[in-house]
Swiss-Prot record:
It catalyses: ATP + H2O + lipid A-core oligosaccharideSide 1 = ADP + phosphate + lipid A-core oligosaccharideSide 2. Involved in lipopolysaccharide (LPS) biosynthesis. Translocates lipid A-core from the inner to the outer leaflet of the inner membrane. Transmembrane domains (TMD) form a pore in the inner membrane and the ATP-binding domain (NBD) is responsible for energy generation. Residues 28-310 form the ABC transmembrane type-1 domain. This is ATP-dependent lipid A-core flippase. The lineage of its organism: Bacteria, Pseudomonadati, Pseudomonadota, Gammaproteobacteria, Enterobacterales. Keywords: ATP-binding, Cell inner membrane, Cell membrane, Lipid transport, Membrane, Nucleotide-binding, Translocase, Transmembrane, Transmembrane helix, Transport. One of its GO terms (molecular function) is ATP hydrolysis activity. Its EC number is 7.5.2.6. The gene is msbA. ATP binds at G376, R377, S378, G379, S380, G381, K382, S383.
Amino acid sequence: MHNDKDLSTWQTFRRLWPTIAPFKAGLIVAGIALILNAASDTFMLSLLKPLLDDGFGKTDRSVLLWMPLVVIGLMILRGITSYISSYCISWVSGKVVMTMRRRLFGHMMGMPVAFFDKQSTGTLLSRITYDSEQVASSSSGALITVVREGASIIGLFIMMFYYSWQLSIILVVLAPIVSIAIRVVSKRFRSISKNMQNTMGQVTTSAEQMLKGHKEVLIFGGQEVETKRFDKVSNKMRLQGMKMVSASSISDPIIQLIASLALAFVLYAASFPSVMDSLTAGTITVVFSSMIALMRPLKSLTNVNAQFQRGMAACQTLFAILDSEQEKDEGKRVIDRATGDLEFRNVTFTYPGREVPALRNINLKIPAGKTVALVGRSGSGKSTIASLITRFYDIDEGHILMDGHDLREYTLASLRNQVALVSQNVHLFNDTVANNIAYARTEEYSREQIEEAARMAYAMDFINKMDNGLDTIIGENGVLLSGGQRQRIAIARALLRDSPILILDEATSALDTESERAIQAALDELQKNRTSLMIAHRLSTIEQADEIVVVEDGIIVERGTHSELLAQHGVYAQLHKMQFGQ
């Protein structure tokens, strides 16, 4: 079992390496800097021999005259290499995290709806934000610890003497200076931390909008828009992180330089006869070693494996998502605009993970330009039929045709470009009203076209009352708008899209009577010259449909016009009687 685990960890790291490899130049520079850093410590320790043997053993003061300059030079070199190694490793880490996030984000946008049905939004957000950050632990944190501590283990032990009493008055003099440096850096840290927290919120919000509005992204072809939006905030997050690293990395060399000046003062003071007579070689050795210990922060090797394993575990969860199969897009047929003829032939469909079919042997024709309404009790399969038209799910048996061709013959982009969707659960993005109406295609439509769509959707009356009109930011998922206003923006979006096929999935079910009247007028405008599939619980909204289809337990049980179905005294008549009390 142990060997299997080791093999799994190694395989995971090998798979992660291609993500790190493009930034290996940063690793090489960091490695060289770490080696020079360790070499400076080793050379510093080697100075103890001439110090003890010549400087004190033979009272050759010339050694103590040139050694301060060497020490200062070594400390400057150490500070520079420490900064370079920390910055380069963190640069690689930031690039790796950003690359993983972009891969995850792009992969998730290509996942089928069934994937999101089985996953919670919080879990997926955690994968994009937290787990991808954990990858840095394996690609940078553990790496820098192992290399640095492996190359300079003696330096780590010496750091235990950082607060040694032997530093005596020198540390007392240094304390206020170090305190000021720490206070200045701490303020910088707080400022950057706030910016990082705000930016992380933007990253999470961007990802959450894509995840919650996945269907809208697919229908309106908004993958590129969402990718650009996510890339922007993700890169902003990376830059904030680099500012934090820069401030952190430069603070250590400053403190180290202060300590090196103190060391130089100790050595210079020791060259005076009055001072030399009161010191022993052992005392100088302790002070010297303690000052060296100040040059490097204490790094612990005890938690490296745990840190590395956390990173590998995060990699495995991310790779599990990246290994998930995306939507099958094997069709080749591309069209500009469909006529709008739809037909279901012996369609049977079962949701993934379930055994009982949601639809059984569905046969349905919707001629171009006609309106067909689906009615039935909750859970009867009405919305499932609509989801199959857009290929959010693929059927088990039968065929669904558009203009005489199976839907699977079309590319997904071409197919979904023919369909506009208005549902009861409208998803709006944290953007302007205009950009929401022209979602994913803002460059294709003029301002006049957007305004005309809003006017036809009876939305301009409330838009004109907003502070910035069409340029008003409406908040996350349109939180600043009422239900009716959100519905009208969705209708304006569908009008502007001008697709030949329209799906209305209980578009007015959650509205009050006044809002429903305004929206119904907009829907009537929207349905003109389009093939429409309406799903409704309120039977009053579908009485004028060309055909009403009654679905019960995944089977079509009745079909006909409103008057014909009432005359049959069947399921539709019962539903009508229940609603209107007749």
